[in-house]
Amino acid sequence: MKNNNEGSTLNKAHWSLWVVGLTAFIWHGLGLFNLAMQLNPNVLAQMPDSHRAIAESRPVWVTIIFALSVLNGAIGGVHLLLKMKFASSSFLISLLAAVVAILHAIIKGNALSIFSPFEISLAIIGPLITGLFFLWYSIKAKKKFWIR
């Protein structure tokens, strides 16, 4: 379909919309699983002391911010799959919340001196890069009228 001046009709979405939407949902679903594991006392007991100390000393507000990040990211993936324009808003909230949680982990949690390079890439660099990508892609999809 061709778009009109009002943007009320959708162009045919590129196949990548489905891949990115599903990837965003799975990535953030894994983040929700990670959050649930960090809140489980049995799992915490099995963590290395340094990692457990970070999780146990984290204020409740940071845990809530982390939850907002992964939940909004998963919702953003669903919004992409449903071709809804709210995807970019969800991904923006997710990215901003991730930045706050990551900054807290670096500044107050001393994560850079505790985590291995692999853990830094997984817990700090990965969320920032994927968050930026999902936000960029959802904005691109909206501009191309793949989502309404």
Residue locations for each model-derived region?
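Topology signature of small-to-medium multi-pass alpha-helical membrane proteins
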Residues: 2-148
